[in-house]
Amino acid sequence: NLGARLDPLILGHHIHSQAAATCELAPKWPEDVGGSPLSYLGRTQLIEQIRYPADFDPSIVDVFNTNTFTFRAADLDHDFELGWYYVEKNVEERKAVQIEHLIGELTAHLPTSWLCVRRSGRTTRFLPMKTPDDLSSARDEIAEMYDAPADGV
């Protein structure tokens, strides 16, 4: 996420909220795949799409996780019960396996503030890059974000 950078407004929001965690969310576009804040087990928490129940329709959620968090460091000095997730991917036309924890699961354990951020323009907080081609196609947006000429990116 090239949009995530230190921002006094985000830090101020996090401190003012007195939450242990702040999770940044972005408006969801039709092609987006990712987690969203949902009420589960009596608490609003980030549920990644790989954890959605089989009959859940993700199109009903209008925001999703940017995978950008701010934490109060003292609240991370614990052992948290986090799930292990097995994900199959194709890398250079070969099947690869990724076994991972999801950082968003910390929202099940920590008081969390939810913050919807801009998704376009100079002040965007969310500019995801999944492939090298994404980087090339986002040249102008990156230049706008960082006040640089597009040919200098």
For the regions a protein language model found, what residue spans apply to each?
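Catalytic core of tubulin tyrosine ligase-like
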Residues: L2-G152
